[in-house]
Amino acid sequence: MAAKDVKFGRTAREKMLRGVDILADAVKVTLGPKGRNVVIDKSFGAPRITKDGVSVAKEVELEDKFENMGAQMLREVASKTNDTAGDGTTTATVLGQAIVQEGAKAVAAGMNPMDLKRGIDLAVNEVVAELLKKAKKINTSEEVAQVGTISANGEAEIGKMIAEAMQKVGNEGVITVEEAKTAETELEVVEGMQFDRGYLSPYFVTNPEKMVADLEDAYILLHEKKLSNLQALLPVLEAVVQTSKPLLIIAEDVEGEALATLVVNKLRGGLKIAAVKAPGFGDRRKAMLEDIAILTGGQVISEDLGIKLESVTLDMLGRAKKVSISKENTTIVDGAGQKAEIDARVGQIKQQIEETTSDYDREKLQERLAKLAGGVAVIRVGGATEVEVKEKKDRVDDALNATRAAVEEGIVAGGGTALLRASTKITAKGVNADQEAGINIVRRAIQAPARQITTNAGEEASVIVGKILENTSETFGYNTANGEYGDLISLGIVDPVKVVRTALQNAASVAGLLITTEAMIAELPKKDAAPAGMPGGMGGMGGMDF
């Protein structure tokens, strides 16, 4: 086992604080509408330019192992906030640094670190309760757009696009962000449930120009096994022909005699029909077929359930207003499923998302959830250069996460103002002087984001913070973008409560651990052995021409 270097007390804390400061100073320049960019060198390709706090934090790796430990713990604040709320990573880093700096001073002055931490926790809980009490629910599309705009660093076009996407696919719908091939940023919405399986034969096409099969007011047969035998299918086909409605067959595969007969019937015009393979594989295929069944109000024909294909009746089939099938995708719009059943299924999938530990499973469950909840929207981010597209995509991702958080828990005045106001409302009392000091640390630290935003804009933070606190209105604050004071909510300068709350809780949690650290252990750097000399016996090589 390699030898270790151990540092104690003040020496350890100073090293750790240095690491915290290096990381936080690199991240906090990006905060606010007038925040600056950070350029990150990449081992291949062009450097990356970003204003995304967590992207900057993830790149900071320090040479000194003790400093690096401090930086890594603060990085954890940004990552955790990003995972939970999707935005607010810079705010969390600024808060973390402020609490650690104040706490380190108090510990150096001889206060008990454990009591300080208890005081910090008391104050943070009170601030969180205050924020949730002040939260304003958002209802209109304009309010969603405002949140998106603020999070995208003031780009109104992005805010508007996110609001439009949310309106189309609902708050639960999936909105993905991709890099566009063009310079334009655009929004594409797929309504209904779409899965990546196309028609099994081009003969099913009803619109030869677009090469798609459109079925209006169709019946849907869901079968989990292969269909190759025509006899078993005949009763269903005859029942559907009587209704003169189209039929879509979704099965593991349709082949041989069954497929040939379906194609011949389609070509003769006796039966409007199309067949596609079921989406997914294995257990996931079963689950997705069940999703389609619930969405369309049908049943999955499965031998596990004791249902034979020959005994299928019309009421076991799903229904949908419209089905559109291309070479690659099938889209089912307006299924006839019961809302209560769909909601129950959505709840079940949400439960699975919470319980799963695999990122891959979580992603697949999110996709299923979106398809059930009403659609998928894709925002394609364009730009003149690759570097610009990547930077813009970071901002769109942040804005999207912030708007989701805002819809979930509501909004408060932005620009760090909500925390600034909360600092004057802390009434918690500690049981001793050290806990009181912990409460005061939070009082001072939660002013840091507002101060940093104004500092980044080149303004005098103390003057502006003083002026905001003089006014008694909860929503009065400073608009850094144009240098004016006013009612921030009506100006559209808002922050999602979930983002502010998560940032503060994570910052306090990690800062509390840093303050209470008394020893640090790291591996000693290995001493390099002296390079070996040239081996002997290489003489006598004269006269050789190289």
Swiss-Prot record:
UniProt KW keywords: ATP-binding, Chaperone, Cytoplasm, Isomerase, Nucleotide-binding
Enzyme class, first EC level, given as a word: isomerase
One of the record's GO cellular component terms: cytoplasm
Molecular functions per Gene Ontology: ATP binding; ATP-dependent protein folding chaperone; isomerase activity; unfolded protein binding
Binding site for ATP: 30-33, 51, 87-91, 415, 495
Subcellular localization: Cytoplasm
Catalytic activity: ATP + H2O + a folded polypeptide = ADP + phosphate + an unfolded polypeptide
Coiled coil: none
Chief localisation class: cytoplasm
EC numbers for this chain: 5.6.1.7
Biological process according to GO: protein refolding
Family classification: Belongs to the chaperonin (HSP60) family.
HAMAP family: CH60
Function: Together with its co-chaperonin GroES, plays an essential role in assisting protein folding. The GroEL-GroES system forms a nano-cage that allows encapsulation of the non-native substrate proteins and provides a physical environment optimized to promote and accelerate protein folding.
Subunit organization: Forms a cylinder of 14 subunits composed of two heptameric rings stacked back-to-back. Interacts with the co-chaperonin GroES.
Official protein name in the record: Chaperonin GroEL
Naturally occurring in which organism (per UniProt): Brucella canis (strain ATCC 23365 / NCTC 10854 / RM-666)
